Swiss-Prot record:
InterPro entries: ATP_synth_b/b'su_bac/chlpt (IPR002146)
Pfam family membership, one: ATP-synt_B
Entry's transmembrane regions: 22-41
Keywords: ATP synthesis, CF(0), Hydrogen ion transport, Ion transport, Membrane, Thylakoid, Transmembrane, Transmembrane helix, Transport
Function: F(1)F(0) ATP synthase produces ATP from ADP in the presence of a proton or sodium gradient. F-type ATPases consist of two structural domains, F(1) containing the extramembraneous catalytic core and F(0) containing the membrane proton channel, linked together by a central stalk and a peripheral stalk. During catalysis, ATP synthesis in the catalytic domain of F(1) is coupled via a rotary mechanism of the central stalk subunits to proton translocation.
CC annotations in GO: plasma membrane-derived thylakoid membrane; proton-transporting ATP synthase complex
Protein name listed in UniProt: ATP synthase subunit b
Subunit and partners: F-type ATPases have 2 components, F(1) - the catalytic core - and F(0) - the membrane proton channel. F(1) has five subunits: alpha(3), beta(3), gamma(1), delta(1), epsilon(1). F(0) has four main subunits: a(1), b(1), b'(1) and c(10-14). The alpha and beta chains form an alternating ring which encloses part of the gamma chain. F(1) is attached to F(0) by a central stalk formed by the gamma and epsilon chains, while a peripheral stalk is formed by the delta, b and b' chains.
Main localization, broad class: membrane
Organism: Prochlorococcus marinus subsp. pastoris (strain CCMP1986 / NIES-2087 / MED4)
Localization per Swiss-Prot or TrEMBL: Cellular thylakoid membrane
């Protein structure tokens, strides 16, 4: 058997520095020096460009989100201002309606009271007048209590129209 001869034939990598050819080592080192930086450089450059692109995209989205937030804040403040104005207007209108209703109720009570004095059934008329007054006051109080929660523009206009029609009928 010739085992030492078998080990020296064929392709193999000899890592013993003293037994290898210095020229082979120089070719390998030059190849690594020449091609490895270009290969790694291209990979790193592509990765860097990808990261920069993602950062720019994220900055653009942040800018858009910031602009949308500012617009939403502006819209909210305008809506709050408009709601405050509507509430103030509805309170003014409800107060004027209440005052007008009270005035009409007082005038009506005075008329009823005057006719009750001259009439035989003045006691019954006074009781009815008192009940009407209390009913009107209770209805006005109840309406005023529930008015801010339910009163929008169209409902308010309908209420004013109904009140005027009711007063004109009486």
């Amino acid at each position: 058997m010739n085992l030492p001869l078998l080990a020296t034939e064929g392709f193999g990598l000899n890592l013993n520095l003293f037994e290898t050819n210095v020229l082979n080592w120089a070719v390998v080192v030059f190849g690594l020096y020449k091609f490895l930086p270009g290969f790694l450089g291209k990979m790193l450059q592509k990765r860097r460009e990808g990261i920069l692109l993602e950062l720019k995209d994220a900055e653009d989205r942040l800018l858009k989100a910031t602009q949308a937030l500012e617009k939403a804040k502006t819209d909210l403040s305008l809506a709050e201002e408009k709601a405050g104005q509507i509430k103030a207007d509805s309170l003014k209108r409800s107060e004027s309606i209440r005052m007008e209703s009270e005035k009409k109720a007082i005038e009506e009570m005075a008329r009823i009271k005057q006719s009750a004095i001259s009439d035989e059934s003045s006691e019954a008329s006074r009781a009815i007048s008192q009940l009407r007054k209390e009913a009107v006051e209770l209805a006005i109080k109840k309406a005023l209590d529930s008015l801010p929660n339910r009163l929008d523009q169209t409902t308010q206009e309908n209420l004013v129209t109904q009140s005027i029609n009711n007063i004109e009928m009486n």
